[in-house]
Amino acid sequence: MLDSLLALGGLVLLRDSVEWEGRSLLKALVKKSALCGEQVHILGCEVSEEEFREGFDSDINNRLVYHDFFRDPLNWSKTEEAFPGGPLGALRAMCKRTDPVPVTIALDSLSWLLLRLPCTTLCQVLHAVSHQDSCPGDSSSVGKVSVLGLLHEELHGPGPVGALSSLAQTEVTLGGTMGQASAHILCRRPRQRPTDQTQWFSILPDFSLDLQEGPSVESQPYSDPHIPPVDPTTHLTFNLHLSKKEREARDSLILPFQFSSEKQQALLRPRPGQATSHIFYEPDAYDDLDQEDPDDDLDI
């Protein structure tokens, strides 16, 4: 599943941390898209172009269209090749394309943009870019669009992260144990239940993706890993686990609605000095002798 993240298109969110960096996985997915013949655009904001291209062979580098916003993010040099609106201008320009060739757009990084731009504006542009191939009237002329966004989750609060998460068709949360990297993949398909999967992997020196066997690779129903599970037995008003003595005491207890033979005899037997009552029935001509309700004319 990790090697087919871009098959569905849309926004793919790569959530990394200080312990488990995600740029290597981003470059591995970029290389895979380039080898598949897709147009690959890189919006480089966080590292230099030389650093990002390092490790790729010349064939891969020639297929990448790199937009450098690292050296001059505000376009102070007024270069002709720079987009006037910066990274957002580049994304908006890609919304106007009519090329049927599939396109992969890599944002390195989404955190850099989120720290400098309004969250609502960024989300609107990302939604427009990642859904342009599904717009009415454009499905026959515009190819599939995949947006890879590298997000440093620890730099942002739950609000912006939740907003980006709601836009993403696929979320990849990086983790691992004992030096082995893992990817928790949450995939949202149209008209289907979300599924999540954990895959173990490693990145080779040439940024090829090497999938490895892990303890759990089967797809499961979605459960958010960031929300702790709730124990339904925490706030009960009764004890679920009884000792042997408590169970015997419970079984010997007679509840108010349970009538034993002794209790029934005690209720029916008149006590000394207790007043007794009698029922008198005097039928008349208008009595309704209904066998199903024989007591409807009683005078007590």
Swiss-Prot record:
Name of the protein in question: Elongator complex protein 5
Main location: nucleus
Known function: Component of the elongator complex which is required for multiple tRNA modifications, including mcm5U (5-methoxycarbonylmethyl uridine), mcm5s2U (5-methoxycarbonylmethyl-2-thiouridine), and ncm5U (5-carbamoylmethyl uridine). The elongator complex catalyzes formation of carboxymethyluridine in the wobble base at position 34 in tRNAs. Involved in cell migration.
Biological process annotations from GO: positive regulation of cell migration; regulation of translation; tRNA modification; tRNA wobble uridine modification
Gene name as annotated: ELP5
Expression across tissues: Ubiquitously expressed with high levels in heart, brain, liver, skeletal muscle and testis.
Assembly, per entry: Component of the elongator complex which consists of ELP1, ELP2, ELP3, ELP4, ELP5 and ELP6; in the complex, is required for optimal binding of ELP3 to ELP4.
Lineage: Eukaryota, Metazoa, Chordata, Craniata, Vertebrata
Modification Phosphoserine occurs at: 252
Pathway assigned to this chain's UniProt record: tRNA modification; 5-methoxycarbonylmethyl-2-thiouridine-tRNA biosynthesis
Post-translational modification: Tyrosine-phosphorylated.
GO cellular component: a single term: nucleoplasm
Subcellular location: Nucleus; Cytoplasm
